[in-house]
Amino acid sequence: MACGLVASNLNLKPGECLKVRGEVAPDAKSFVLNLGKDSNNLCLHFNPRFNAHGDANTIVCNSKDNGAWGTEHREPAFPFQPGSTVEVCITFDQADLTIKLPDGHEFKFPNRLNMEAINYMAADGDFKIKCVAFE
């Protein structure tokens, strides 16, 4: 995967929403949105896989604590289509991150690192970001 957008000093607080809108490549295999303190401390590794790493049409979520990956969570909902424009909304609190998918489906992923602010975001893979908004 080519290196995509990286942003720091976001200071996203609990209850605030991070909206990411972009275009999925027509031949997409997977893409990644990482959120956390920095690249080694991620409260959310959000990885929709069209056909990658042995997964097909599956969202894989994980966390990374001081460079060590946690246990993967697989979400069966998969509203992504190659060649489409999508929007994902992410909010968090002390306990969980809530991910709202393009079709309105929501699921929770535990805030394993107990982050009180999200300062880092990175996007990579077969996804071209068009808009990032904070609400």
Swiss-Prot record:
CDD domains: GLECT. One of its GO terms (molecular function) is receptor ligand activity. It comes from the Eukaryota. The modification N6-acetyllysine is found at residues 13, 19, 29, 108, 128. A beta-D-galactoside binds at residues 45-49, 53, 62, 69-72. The keyword Membrane does not apply. It is found in: Cytoplasm; Secreted, Extracellular space, Extracellular matrix; Secreted. The modification N6-succinyllysine is found at residue 108. Residues 4-135 form the Galectin domain. The modification Phosphoserine is found at residue 30. One of its GO terms (biological process) is apoptotic process. GO terms for cellular component: cytosol; extracellular space; galectin complex; plasma membrane. The modification N-acetylalanine is found at residue 2. The keyword Nucleotide-binding does not apply. Keywords: Acetylation, Apoptosis, Cytoplasm, Extracellular matrix, Lectin, Phosphoprotein, Secreted. Lectin that binds beta-galactoside and a wide array of complex carbohydrates. Plays a role in regulating apoptosis, cell proliferation and cell differentiation. Inhibits CD45 protein phosphatase activity and therefore the dephosphorylation of Lyn kinase. Strong inducer of T-cell apoptosis. Binds LGALS3BP. Interacts with CD2, CD3, CD4, CD6, CD7, CD43, ALCAM and CD45. Interacts with laminin. Interacts with SUSD2. Exists in a reversible and active monomer-homodimer equilibrium, the mononomer/dimer state is regulated by lectin concentration. Interacts with cargo receptor TMED10; the interaction mediates the translocation from the cytoplasm into the ERGIC (endoplasmic reticulum-Golgi intermediate compartment) and thereby secretion. PANTHER family: GALECTIN (PTHR11346), GALECTIN-1 (PTHR11346:SF97). This is Galectin-1. The lineage of its organism: Eukaryota, Metazoa, Chordata, Craniata, Vertebrata. The gene is LGALS1.
